């Protein structure tokens, strides 16, 4: 799931750098967020999974928008399962806003996923997560990664999300890198190794 103002094609170059041949055929799905006015950008209409109401991403959250995107990604997961892909072979991943939606949706999904990936983002509606998360994903592996110089989504928010997930008993692999709000080669390598582990069939 892509970030604010981007589209699904943003993830294509990253997917092309991953070598997952060791776990058999892998298919990537790159959905696009709807276009909507974004408050923090002066109401400018752009692709967004939800509205950003202010610089403090968690003090005022667009719960309606978040839940609408959760429903859209749930529908996408159901379509994939209807194609014959079991939930246990699906990894839900996102960057920035996409990270927030991936974490929110994955933790609440009613069937156990192979894993959840959150890059340069945070856990939204964190106070509601303990009551709303589904037991089916209580032990689902989570990969979180963030840039130490990120001035768009500060790393402190990601660290708080990491701590919250650990407190709930989730198996979280955490990485941070000397970069801003972006993705780096080392991160892709770490993600590759993690994906090989969570998708291993033996």
Label each residue range with its predicted role.
Residues 143-146, 150:
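Short beta-strand/loop motif that positions the catalytic acidic residue
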Residues 81, 86-137:
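Primarily recognizes the serine-hydrolase "nucleophile elbow" in alpha/beta-hydrolase
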Residues 1-91:
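Serine-hydrolase catalytic machinery in alpha/beta-hydrolase-like enzymes
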Residues 11-16, 130, 154-164:
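Short alpha-helix in the alpha/beta-hydrolase fold that links the catalytic acid
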Residues 31-35, 121, 179:
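Active-site loop/turn elements of alpha/beta-hydrolase fold enzymes
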Residues 137-142, 168-171:
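Short, proline-enriched alpha-helix->beta-strand connector loops that line the catalytic pocket
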Residues 18-24, 84, 109-112, 166-170, ...:
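Short helix-capping segments at alpha-helix termini
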